[in-house]
């Protein structure tokens, strides 16, 4: 009977440690690094740069609910501007941009254009 209790306690302890470890590993693959005026600045891991769902979640977290919002995304923190206007290099390094206007209901996520994208396509150039 005592061995069963020890086994149950050990199993619970192991399950708790594993749950805590998996939570620590499941860190978001983006970070809100600041703002310039009303523009929110977010860095994403390169592998997440084209993940629309993740980018929308990051934008929702960075924006104030019910307010107009622009979120600019980079995959390299070294390219995030510290002032406006941003340089051409910083602008080219942007991987996505999210825009929300709650008055009109407009909401748009533009991803970086793939090379060879048609000129009229809706993407971040």
Predicted regions and their residues:
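N-terminal signal peptide c-region/cleavage motif recognized by signal peptidases
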Residues: 21-22
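Mature extracytoplasmic domains of secretory-pathway proteins
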Residues: 39, 43-97
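C-terminal partner/receptor-binding element of secreted or periplasmic proteins
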Residues: 90-125
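Intrinsic disorder/low-complexity detector
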Residues: 5-6, 78, 103
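Bacterial N-terminal signal peptides that target proteins for export
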Residues: 1-14
